[in-house]
Amino acid sequence: MLQAKAPPVTRNDYQEMPEGPPYFQVIEGELVMSPSPKMFHQDIVANLCHLLRQYLEKNPVGVVCVAPLDVFLSDVNVFQPDVIFVSSARRSILTEHGIEGAPDLVVEILSPGTVRYDKGSKRKIYARTGVKELWIVDPELKSIQVYHLTRNAETPAATHDASVVFKSALLPGLKIKTAAIFKSSLRK
């Protein structure tokens, strides 16, 4: 017996939900629950945010935000990227309810529950909706894949391991020691 396909979840449906936790995203009209991240994941978020804010204090070219914060990319795509950068030129997309449109830079930190979305459909949607640069951070491999989405959404422009200093084409003068991103507050 055929079952009727449920209608897509829209931005309006999403906004009527109670505030989290648990946290959800809408990916191509599908409601997807985001499990709570692990401690190392949160260390990476904090480290990246700290490094980006240090850069922005000296180079006030935009604002950095962290999850949970809604990014409304379309009526059926509402994401909560781990770290977000919006340039000063595009500051008008920042609202009380989240971000209305594509940020300039999105950072997704992989976790077992999100890897297929982060590396698959979300990457493609980011490219389609105008995100310029995407960093996919892999805590297991301690590596960062950098995508220049306006040029090539399928192949990373670079992959950096924990031994390098990397730069962003989007943020002139930014130099990040990759190892600094992977500092953990847990003793090993």
Residue ranges and their predicted role:
Residues 1-188:
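Gly/Pro/Ser/Thr-rich low-complexity, intrinsically disordered segments predominantly at protein N-termini
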